[in-house]
């Protein structure tokens, strides 16, 4: 599942696209940029593909944002044998898992800080995702395990 959000900094908006594994809740791909566009979504997708090496025909769900509907993004999906799925119009519940992640990110990090520059926000978001959220943060839906700990118990 993939989606985008924005974080306001002293230099303007910094956009973040994330790819979430719905089963383990792990953020497997992400990218940040001052521009919310197809190259940003493609960067997050490529990171996810590199980390996961998904099986052909895996479904990647997103909302109907223009960056996810772009020909360039769809071409990269096709190159990796992935199938696109998009939310029903006006139905935020289709993206509930990643909207929950955005809520956690914002309430646990963003709303408590004022980021003067992009680099400051990038560093904090990187640490939140890679050090805290994926490795440490417990999820009730995962029997109170972190995403990485939950995945390690599967193998």
Locate predicted features.
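Charged DNA-binding/catalytic regions of mobile-element recombinases
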Residues: 1-155
């Amino acid at each position: 599942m993939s989606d985008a959000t924005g974080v306001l900094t002293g230099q303007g908006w910094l956009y973040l696209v994330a790819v979430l594994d719905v089963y383990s809740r792990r953020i497997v791909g992400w990218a940040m940029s001052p521009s919310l566009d197809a190259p940003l979504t493609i960067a997050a997708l490529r990171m996810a593909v590199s980390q996961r090496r998904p099986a052909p025909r895996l479904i990647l769900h997103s909302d109907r944002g223009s960056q996810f509907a772009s020909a360039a993004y769809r071409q990269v999906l096709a190159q990796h044998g992935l199938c696109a799925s998009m939310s029903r119009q006006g139905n935020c519940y289709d993206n509930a898992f990643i909207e929950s992640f955005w809520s956690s990110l914002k309430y646990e990090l963003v709303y408590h800080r004022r980021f003067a520059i992009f680099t400051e926000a990038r560093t904090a978001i990187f640490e939140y995702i890679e050090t805290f959220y994926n490795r440490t943060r417990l999820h009730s839906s995962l029997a109170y395990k972190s995403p990485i700990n939950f995945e390690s118990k599967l193998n």
